[in-house]
Amino acid sequence: MAVPASPQHPRGYGILLLTLLLKALATTASACNHLRPQDATFSHDSLQLFRDMAPTLLQLCPQHNASCSFNDTILDTSNTRQADKTTHDILQHLFKILSSPSTPAHWNDSQRQSLLNRIHRYTQHLEQCLDSSDTRSRTRWPRNLHLTIKKHFSCLHTFLQDNDYSACAWEHVRLQARAWFLHIHNLTGNTRT
């Protein structure tokens, strides 16, 4: 006669579940660890590429009245996930505007391609990090921040169109883009140290 199998002890299930949960959390945490070394150099290297790509325009430009102001105090956060989402959003907008076929002739196209590749790769890394952190946290990103950033970049696009993508209009956008790279530096530096 066969001996009936003893029922699995509930504590055994708990240990198995805890082991699986810890493994999932370790995998999720490591998904964002690869960003730390990149954060240290991404903004600096991107700014350098940007300077090489888009030198300051030598001609004097009339003062443009671009009403594309941005209150950068809303970017202040110590929440790493929010900083990552904000950085991701900014980079997507920068990529869109800098990949325009109407960039000025004096911009170095190979440097521009290098910068766009760098932005694209970093954005992909952020997406992986955000996808994995979404399994742990459902913290909502402030909608007004997303809309404010979107409105600002929409204003820059309109400004370029209204000024027929002139070199002077691009000079204004160049200055704005430089400021955005500095914002990204502050976002990534303040939340990952």
Curated annotation (Swiss-Prot):
Major location category of this protein: secreted
Protein known as: Interferon type A3
GO molecular-function term, one example from the UniProt record: type I interferon receptor binding
Lineage, uppermost ranks: Eukaryota, Metazoa, Chordata, Craniata, Vertebrata
Key words of the record: Antiviral defense, Cytokine, Disulfide bond, Glycoprotein, Secreted, Signal
Residues with glycosylation annotation: 65, 71, 108, 186
Subcellular localization, as worded in the UniProt entry: Secreted
Disulphides: 32-129, 61-155, 68-168
Gene3D superfamilies tied to this protein: 1.20.1250.10
Record-level GO cellular component terms: extracellular space
Stated family: Belongs to the alpha/beta interferon family.
PROSITE patterns, sorted: INTERFERON_A_B_D
